[in-house]
Structure formats: C-alpha cells, structure tokens
Amino acid sequence: MNTTTLTLNESWLSRRNLFDWVFAALVVAGGLFAFARYAGSMDYYEKPILIAAVIATIAIGWFWRPLRVLAIVVAAASLLAIASYQGDLARADTVFWLKYFLSSQSAILWMSVLFFMSTLFYWLGFFGGKQADTFDAIGSRLAWAAVTMALIGTMVRWYESHQLGPDIGHIPVSNLYEVFVLFCWLTAVFYLYFEERYGTRALGAFVMLVVSAAVGFLLWYTIVREAHEIQPLVPALQSWWMKLHVPANFIGYGTFALAAMVAFAYLIKEQAEEKRWYKLTPIWLLGVALCFVPVAFRQRVQEAGGSYWVIYAGISALIAAGILLGRKRIAARLPANEVLDDVMYKSITVGFAFFTIATVLGALWAADAWGGYWSWDPKETWALIVWLNYAAWLHMRLMSGLRGRPAAWWALVGLLVTTFALDRKSVV
C-alpha cells in the first residue's frame, strides 16, 4: 500500500528554494556594499530607507519571481555605469557604454523607445492573425526591457546627482521629469504582474497607451525645458517625508491609470456589436481624454509647444477612432468580463491603499515643512476629492456589488477627476 505524507500549514520560509536564498544573499550583500561605500553621502533618513528597501526587495522578489531577475540586472548594470564614471561625469561623453546606454539620460531615452515599441507590438497582437501571440510576447518583453532601462536610469541619476555636489544629491523623485519616469515604470510593472497573474497579454495594448502618452509628455518636457538637467532641491523638498510620499502617491496614480485603461477595454468589449455611432461617441471622447492625462502638467511650464500638441491631439483622436473601428476583432481577443472586472477592482484597491498612505505622509511632510498638517489649500483639497472618489467606488463595490459597465465608467471618470486634481495641485 502506498502512503503519502502531507505537510500541513507549511511555513512561508520553508517554501523557499535555493535560488530564493541566493537572491536574498545577493540583495543583502548589495545593501551592505552600498552602505559601506556611500554611507558618508547618505542623510540620516536614507539609511533606514536603504534597510527597508533591502527587506522589501527580498520579500517582493520571493512573492513574484520575475522581479528577482529584474533586480539583479538593474543592480549589475547600475554598478557597471558607476564604475565606468570613475567619479568623473564628463566620461558620459567618451565612454561607449555610458554615452549610448547607461548614463541616466541615455537609459531613459531607451526606456522611451522601448515603451513605444512595446505599445506597437501589443497592438499588432490584435491584428496579427496567426502571429498574434508572437507579437504579444514581443510586446511583453519590450515592456520588461523598458522597465529595466527606466530603473537603471533612475539609479544612475541618483549617483550622478551626488557627483554634482554634496548638497545637490537626492533620490530622483523630486521633480516632474523624475516622477514621470517613476509613473511609467510603476504602471508597467503593475500591468506585467497582472499579465502573468491572469495569463493574458491582451490588456497590454491598452495599458501601454497611457504609458506611451506619459512618455510623449516626458520627451516634450525634456526638449522644451531641458528637464533632464539635475538641479538642487529647494528646502521644502529636502524633507525625508517627501521621499516616501511621492513613490506612494505615484503607485496610486499608476494603478488608477491602469484600472481606467482596463475599464476602457471593458467598454470596448461591451460595445463590440454596437452599430449606432452616437452611442460610441462618448467612448471615443474618453479614449482621446485618456491619452491627454499627462497633459494636465503642461500648463505648469511657460512654453506652449503648440504644433507638438496639435500633432499629439490628432494622433490621439486617430488612435481612439481606430480602436472603435477594430472593436470586434479587439473584443474577440480580450479576456472575459469577469477578468477585466477583477483586474479593475484589484488595481483600484492597491491604488487606494497607497494613495491613503501618501496622503498621511503628505500631512506629516506639511507639518515638518510648513508647521501644519492640513490647511485646505488646493493640493490638499483635491487630494481629498480623489481619495473620496475611490473610497466611494470601493464602498459601492463591496457593499452594493458594483460591477460591469457602471464600474468601468466610474473608473474612467475617476481617472479624469484625478487628472483634473493634478492640474490644480503640485506634483507631490
């Protein structure tokens, strides 16, 4: 007689394999190396952030294994870039790897190109016939490559800022250029997690549209304002609360944007057989509006860039119209409505949790910088409006079973509310 021994209530740690522990050892070694080499350049708050980052990286890498490879590649490439500089930023113009790949600006330009290419291949997946799965796979790999270059650019930019002077170095989450890079890779990473979790790549075409829109703004902002230049922080931005507040905030913004694009896909699937164009017009208008989410930040700068935005508007309108024209073929490849609804719900749940944390951290930052937790100025008032909007969405979902088309429309309008709020308040 065969007997089988069952292990009940196996602990989380006991389920770790050899690669898990090797990864943890590498992360700890990297953290110790960073502390030993750069502790003198760290502010008092950056040391506990480093410790927390080591713990979080190990935990997240164990939870979602693709992030382990990402972390190792980013760390190796960042260290190669730092070693190539040899303490001289002028080497970015003479060393091949720095000039074309690993300086912060080069890496972020590669991020931009790769996100555009990823978006293209994801959309080719809807119309590629027998090659559709191949196109989707290429789109996914390009998205991973773009995230990798974004993180390399961020890490190297952090190093570059410290090389400019002891009072200039800072974690690169402090201006519009840096937070748009943050938004792009955070949104993409959350999408890639859902892609693996639900076993479908069809949503990549929609999510990468809003990421590409953000990249389009980033490139315009770089050209018009030379925003890639590293500048010293004003005193109010030197608070360590801000270094926690901004990433938490943009996890919220990124997942809210992801939920809105999934909601857009849901409505396209629902309207696949609709022939009356007047009923499709609201979806077309919202599709164009979604592409303009990053443009909420444009009026912060003085340069109009009129011709660029005319072209941008035209491309956005054509993309939205093309999606509606191909809605039957697109709907056929989209996952079931239940999957779309679940991704929407989980994205908003994650976003709401981090936006709540960011709001609390923002209040602590305000108290530290300006002496009061809450003053009802525009940025605080609109942050509260955004929070209440998504709190109401989740309440209706949990208490009244909000699902389907009403939930999708609300998620879409919710992102527009968030965009309007961002237009009325500072980035951070």
Question: Where in the sequence are the language-model features?
Answer:
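Conserved small/polar residues in nucleotide/adenosyl-binding loops
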Residues: 427
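Membrane-interface helix-loop-helix modules in multi-pass inner-membrane proteins
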Residues: 12-13, 39-47, 86-87, 147-207, ...
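Hydrophobic cores of alpha-helical transmembrane segments in multi-pass inner/ER membrane proteins
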Residues: 48-58, 108-121, 179-192, 247-265, ...
